[in-house]
Each structure stands twice: as C-alpha cells, then as structure tokens.
Amino acid sequence: MEAKRSRRPIERNVAMELVRVTEAAALAAARFLGMGDKNQVDAAAVSAMRFVLGKVHMDGIVVIGEGEKDEAPMLYIGEKIGDGSSLRVDIAVDPVDGTTLTAKGLPGAISAVALSARGTMNCPRQVVYVNKIVAGREAKDVVDINAPVAEHLKNIARAKRMKVSELTVVVLDRPRHEQLISESRGAGARIKLISDGDVAASIQAALPETGVDVLMGIGGTPEGVLSAAAIRCIGGVIQCKAWPRDDKE
C-alpha cells in the first residue's frame, strides 16, 4: 500500500481546521474516560467530529467511516460532508481508534482524520484485515512484507544501526499473532503487546525515539489506510498486504 502518484497537497488552512476536528472528537470522548462504556465513547466522538467537519471549507465524501449508510447515522461511507466549498476531497475518519482503551481509562487511543484529493483514497472494504509493517524512514529501502520475520528484523536493525536484540516490535495482542511473536522473540527482538490502538502505534513506529522501532501484524484495513496517510505526512515506511479471512474475501 505504497502510493506512487504525486498528489496535490491539502491547503494549509484546511489542515489546521482538521486539528479542530480531532480535538473536538477527543474532548468529547474524554468525558467518558474510564467509565466502562466504549459505545458512549464512540457516540460522543462521532457526534462531535461530524459537527465540526460539517463546517470545514471543503466538498468531502467519506470513504472510510463508521460503516455503511444503513449501519451508521453519521460519518457513514458515501456521506457528503463539509460546507460545499470548491476543495473536493476524500475523507477517512476514525473518531476514536481505541474506544475500549478509553472506556478502561488506558492510554493509546487517538482521534484520526485523513484527507486526499477526490478519487485518490481507496479502502478495499471487502477485505476486513491487512497485514502491515511500519518502521522509520531509515528502513525504507529494506522493508519487505514478504520476507521471513527473522530476516526482516535483521535488515531493519542494520538500517537503524542497532542490534536485533535492541529492537522493540509492537504487535496487537491477538491469537493470530502467536507465530509472529514467537519468531520475533526467537530472532532476539523485544515484543510490546497492545490490546488496541494500532494507528497510534504505527505513528510511534515511524517516529524516532518513541521506544518503538517496528510495528508488525494484522489489523483492520481502515486503520491501515489511516496509518499510511499519517506516515506519508511524517515520514517512515509502511507496507500492507490484504489478509483475507476466507475464500469469499
């Protein structure tokens, strides 16, 4: 999932408006921090994000959102949003990536919005999960999602001028990752398990001096697209590969 086409950058004033959008969603969700109800967290964030997005100077269409139109009252896929200005964009939203974390009073949740020129953002909704690898910009020439785990970690460590034993790999704590965790530890790397929030973890893996060097494993496709958008802005490398759950996908 590495974009090759050049894209016209989003105007700076619109980018600043998006800060207000995520700020509103985060503040609304924070009212339910530690209250134990992730649905309240999500509902508050969705409502606040939708309200502020409606005032942004753009003609937007939601391509990644809260679900199909019959599944979500707001921020559904295909919803038109913004004040109808001339800037035509695709929008990806996740009002809170980490609703369970927020409900439990834990860190790691993030509110995310990504914009790109109309017709340039794609999310293959028929495939729910993607396998992804994220690392910092120094590893951009060595990341290969098809390489064996041990070889991959060795190459990333060399690019970062570290030993494999000094690498910290963040992985979602899921049964499907047992082999990945075993192979990573077998290669000598440390594992940091997270219960949720792989968008924030992807950003950490791409930035220096965060205590995280690599993110690996299978997560949601929408989160993969949002992570890719963030890493396109901040630098780093991300590779994604569809992970179909069955023959239908």
Model-derived segments and their meaning:
Residues 54-55, 80-86, 94, 102-106, ...:
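Solvent-exposed alpha-helices and their adjacent loops that cap or buttress functional pockets
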Residues 189, 195-199, 212-214, 219, ...:
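Gly/Ser/Thr-rich active-site loops/lids in small-molecule metabolic enzymes
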Residues 62-66, 91-93, 102-104, 123-124, ...:
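General beta-strand structural signal in soluble alpha/beta enzymes
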Residues 112, 118-194:
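Acidic beta-strand-loop-alpha-helix segment within the catalytic core
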Residues 1-92, 151-154, 158, 199-200:
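N-terminal subdomain of lithium-sensitive/metallo-dependent phosphomonoesterases centered on the IMPase/IPPase/PAP
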Residues 86-97, 101-121:
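DPxDG-like acidic metal-binding loop motif
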Residues 74-76, 104-106, 115, 125-127, ...:
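Short acidic, glycine/serine/threonine-rich loops at helix termini
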